[in-house]
Amino acid sequence: MVFSSNVLEHVPDPMGLIEEMIRATRPGGLVYLSYTNWYSPWGGHEMSPWHLLGPRYAERRYIKRYQRKPKHEVGANLFRVHVGPVLRALRARPDVEIVAARPRYYPRWCRLLLRLPGLREVATWNLMLIMRRVG
């Protein structure tokens, strides 16, 4: 099993990380991936929810309130990762089977949110994926 929790949004090449996780997994093995997506209320981490009005605005607001820069800087150690593109990329791969996909921290029935393209980006605070490497 290869495991990553709340790391994906902190790397400049999220799809590259996913690719490497799958590559490092034996056939039949599992990949666990969870991440906070950008459009969720917590996508801007400590600058949330103000990141939804733009990262520069969120940073200025944070500095004004706390008199210091935030720990995360969009484009340096926090990157915009979305639910739809990740799901589409994984579904298109012949070497991966998605075993489970649902919003983490929510009841299981909330996995239905992932079927609603616009809503899933905002309502899925943290996406949890379990994948099996095929072949």
Can you annotate each of these PLM segments?
Residues P12-E20, A24-R26, L30-L129, V134:
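S-adenosyl-L-methionine-dependent methyltransferase catalytic module, highlighting the catalytic core
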Residues N6-H10:
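A short His-aromatic
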Residues F3:
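A conserved beta-strand element that flanks and buttresses the S-adenosyl-L-methionine
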